[in-house]
Amino acid sequence: MPGKIKKNLFGYNEEMGFTKEELKEMSLSCPSLLCTDVQRKVVPQFEVLHNEAKIPHDVLAKFPSSLLAPWVPTRSRLRFLQSLGRDQFDPKLANYVSPELLTVKSDEIFCEKAARCSPVLFDDYQRTL
């Protein structure tokens, strides 16, 4: 196993706390996770998704590509959802927002499906930051 992949697996397992089973699931559905710089790209996004949004490991393992999204827009969207009272990331409860929706590339899709508001409202919110 090449050194970079081995180092990345260590980061996912030891630093972020993913189990070997979760890592296998994540690697099969999003192989680019193994080649991405964990410290620079994944850890900051993990901090937002897991530590700030309180999204558990098992949910993140089902949406591994969300770990590759840029962390700054994700944090902004999270805070926007919190301001609206729509920051619900438990799949067992109503009004669930998946990590995939939180990190979708399009602000329009995020606003329509996750925040349930107009993109204009989100743009106005971002100008206040």
Regions of interest found by a model, annotated:
Residues 1-129:
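Long amphipathic alpha-helical repeat/alpha-solenoid cores
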